[in-house]
Amino acid sequence: MSLLIGSHVSMSGKKMLLQSSEEAASYGATTFMIYTGAPQNTRRKAIEDLNIEAGKAHMAEHGLSNIVVHAPYIINIGNTQKPETFRLGVDFLRSEIERTEAIGAKQIVLHPGAHVGAGAEEGIKKIIEGLNEVLTEKRDVQIALETMAGKGSECGCTFEELAKIIDGVTHNERLSVCFDTCHTHDAGYDIVNDFDGVLDEFDRIIGAERIKVVHINDSKNERSARKDRHENIGHGHIGLKALDYIVHHDQFKDIPKILETPFIGKDKKDKRPPYKHEIALLRRELLEPIEK
């Protein structure tokens, strides 16, 4: 089976899902990840305007599968301070799951939430409350809780915190995990020198079978920086060797591996996606990281 690897791609204009599939195919990808609209607002097109059938036909023709949706950043079900933010998060997440199912994706990646000053324990309680509200309807979609870097008041930057959330949710068979390499590195896990040790720890605390998506990113920061700044493959503190090992790890062979690395180019007008090169690099078809 060919390596299940792709990147974040856009979905906009008239073509919508077809455009996403065309972009992914142009990178030589076998999978991809999308937002169903702008990640910073709630404006969304109707499901019938997402051009799903044409998108699916193009995907089938070009060997693209196991696509992933990312929930927008504006969802924060960990917010204990503003009931309206929590309510918006729950309602919007519910509608995003509906759209995810319509598109044919099985995983929607979610940043668990930020406690905005109330403390991790209170934030986690709120996240559990929100997920219990969202996961009442029967849908063929799992929410993939993302491993976070620990920036600001983020919850879910340790495996123990994610385990607490999962244990508190009634229908937790509908929860999975998105393992982000930059975030786990920035949170303090030594994925560079001891990835198997980190995976064993994850397995002991959560269960490795919960990992259903992997975000492949290098990091601009040293381990434990709690910063969350993605870097291009081979240009950061994780490095190509460690990321190559993770991408080709047996545990992840049937799991979509998604690049979210920064666009490259000397100035703002010249920015372009690095994904065609980075996918080939991680397929071991190229030897050198992309020139920035």
UniProtKB/Swiss-Prot annotation:
Q: Which residues are recorded as binding Zn(2+) 1?
A: H70, H111, E146
Q: Which reaction is this enzyme known to catalyze?
A: Endonucleolytic cleavage to 5'-phosphooligonucleotide end-products
Which residues are recorded as binding Zn(2+) 2? E146, D180, H215, E260
Q: Which PROSITE patterns does the UniProt record give?
A: AP_NUCLEASE_F2_1, AP_NUCLEASE_F2_2, AP_NUCLEASE_F2_4
Q: Which UniProt keywords apply?
A: DNA damage, DNA repair, Endonuclease, Hydrolase, Metal-binding, Nuclease, Zinc
Q: What is its EC number?
A: 3.1.21.2
Keyword Metal-binding tagged:
yes
Signal peptide interval: none
Q: Which domain of life is it from?
A: Bacteria
Q: Give the required cofactors.
A: Zn(2+)
Q: Name one GO molecular function term.
A: DNA-(apurinic or apyrimidinic site) endonuclease activity
**Record's cofactor remark:** Binds 3 Zn(2+) ions.
- Cell division as a keyword of this entry, yes or no, is no
A biological process (GO) of this protein is:
base-excision repair
Question: For binding Zn(2+) 3, which residues are annotated in this chain's numbering?
Answer: H183, D228, H230
Query: What's its top-level EC category?
Result: hydrolase
Its biological purpose is as follows: Endonuclease IV plays a role in DNA repair. It cleaves phosphodiester bonds at apurinic or apyrimidinic (AP) sites, generating a 3'-hydroxyl group and a 5'-terminal sugar phosphate.
Recorded hits in HAMAP family, A to Z, give: Nfo (MF_00152)
Q: Family membership, please give it.
A: Belongs to the AP endonuclease 2 family.
Q: What is this protein called?
A: Probable endonuclease 4
Source species of the chain: Shouchella clausii (strain KSM-K16)
Primary gene name: nfo
